[in-house]
């Protein structure tokens, strides 16, 4: 089949690679001049199969109110008259129950664990290197209350068979020796040892190169204008360079996916939540992280990427704006320098990207009411983590092959 993948971020590139391996003639279309130049460009670098949780969780509404008044808040809300924003926020609040949290986290862990084995197979198959490390994620707690609140996550990990270790202060320091100098600032942590780290941009570019060798065509610098739909079936894509015919189309446009499909009555509850990152050179390796540390207080990930530290996080709900707020940079600098002052923050590269978030935290992967039109989007902060498994799921669905995991509850049909 002739398949068009819309979007050349990490989700689009991995999808194209797996579709090509499945025997399809694949074209990737993206407005940027190369792969992974938007949300996938400078994400936090964590490939967190175990540290995988919905933002919609019990207690979050009250925490959100408190965060709004914090100096270094993990959440920034800039309300506006925007029906999509208000609808998305209402749906997210409805998922902040213990029952919904358990269902959503189980879905996410299922896909993340599948992605773990899929990424391992892909790495072995392609021999791609991308500043990868396989030393786990340490969720770091500064207070006893944070440690106690991790019980629900521990229960979910145990139920899904995901390895974990609950660490005391000394255990955290053994995992991340640089924390020894700030031992009084931490009380414990939760280590998910199967988690990894790596540079998403490097990986996406290397895999795009492998995909081209398989015959995938990358049509960069091309605006996507509309889908061509007739008789309940997709027939192609209208672009700034003309029409492209297709037997199937995979929409992997991140936060922009809903804007493309809504004219066909597809109400895709994906909304942009801006995240920020700061990439700084390491000046003193003894005071730098070994792998990824999640600072639970500020909801910030601090990740070792070769000779760099990538600090990423925060959630700014402000629509489709990509401006850089200097206050957000100060928050990132505060978190990393407080725990790991081995980097030169003054030389840091500051960046922001729009994460495509669903209200329940689970991505939308699967068919739509339009024959031949598929979605692979809405991965939020976990696009890098879930990309390899999501790509195999979408390739199997497009190819009408038996899936290796249950993906029925990942489709848009779950929203009714």
Curated annotation (Swiss-Prot):
Transmembrane segments: none
Keywords: FAD, Flavoprotein, Oxidoreductase
Pfam families on file: DAO
Record: residues binding FAD: 3-17
Catalytic activity: a D-alpha-amino acid + A + H2O = a 2-oxocarboxylate + AH2 + NH4(+)
GO BP term, pick one: D-alanine catabolic process
A molecular function GO annotation: D-amino-acid dehydrogenase activity
EC number of this enzyme: 1.4.99.-
Flavoprotein in keyword set: yes
Family to which this protein belongs: Belongs to the DadA oxidoreductase family.
Its biological purpose: Oxidative deamination of D-amino acids.
Name of the protein: D-amino acid dehydrogenase
Lineage: Bacteria, Pseudomonadati, Pseudomonadota, Alphaproteobacteria, Hyphomicrobiales
Gene: dadA
């Amino acid at each position: 089949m002739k398949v068009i993948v819309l979007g050349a971020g990490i989700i689009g590139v991995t999808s194209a690679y797996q579709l090509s391996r499945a025997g399809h003639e694949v074209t990737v279309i993206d407005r940027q001049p190369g792969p992974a130049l938007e949300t996938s460009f400078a994400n936090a670098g964590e490939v967190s199969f175990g540290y995988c949780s919905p933002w919609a969780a019990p207690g979050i509404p009250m925490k959100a109110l408190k965060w709004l008044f914090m100096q270094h808040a993990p959440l920034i809300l800039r309300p506006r008259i925007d029906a999509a924003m208000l609808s998305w926020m209402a749906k997210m609040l409805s998922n902040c129950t213990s029952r919904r949290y358990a269902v959503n986290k189980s879905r996410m862990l299922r896909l993340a664990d599948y992605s773990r084995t899929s990424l391992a197979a892909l790495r072995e198959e392609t021999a791609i290197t991308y500043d990868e490390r396989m030393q786990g994620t340490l969720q770091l707690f500064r207070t006893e209350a944070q440690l106690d609140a991790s019980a629900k996550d521990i229960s979910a990990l145990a139920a899904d068979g995901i390895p974990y270790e609950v660490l005391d202060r000394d255990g955290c320091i053994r995992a991340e020796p640089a924390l020894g100098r700030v031992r009084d600032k931490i009380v414990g942590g939760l280590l998910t040892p199967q988690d990894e780290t790596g540079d998403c941009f490097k990986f996406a570019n290397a895999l795009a190169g492998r995909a081209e060798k398989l015959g995938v065509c990358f049509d960069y610098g091309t605006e996507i204008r509309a889908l061509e739909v007739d008789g309940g079936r997709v027939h192609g894509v209208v672009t700034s360079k003309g029409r492209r015919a297709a037997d199937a189309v995979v929409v992997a446009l991140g936060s922009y996916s809903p804007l493309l499909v809504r004219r066909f009555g597809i109400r895709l509850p994906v909304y942009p939540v801006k995240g920020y990152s700061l990439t700084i050179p390491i000046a003193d390796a003894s005071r730098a992280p070994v792998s990824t540390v999640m600072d639970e207080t500020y909801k910030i990930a601090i990740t070792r990427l070769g000779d760099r530290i990538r600090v990423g996080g925060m959630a700014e709900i402000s629509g489709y704006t990509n401006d850089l707020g200097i206050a957000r940079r100060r928050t990132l600098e505060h978190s990393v320098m407080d725990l790991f002052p081995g980097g030169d923050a003054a030389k840091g590269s500051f960046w922001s990207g729009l994460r495509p978030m669903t209200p329940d935290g689970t991505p939308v992967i699967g068919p739509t009411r339009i024959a031949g039109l598929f979605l692979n989007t809405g991965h939020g902060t976990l696009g890098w983590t879930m990309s390899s498994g999501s790509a195999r799921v979408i390739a199997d669905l497009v190819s009408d092959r038996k899936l290796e995991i249950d993906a029925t509850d990942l489709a848009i049909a779950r929203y009714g």
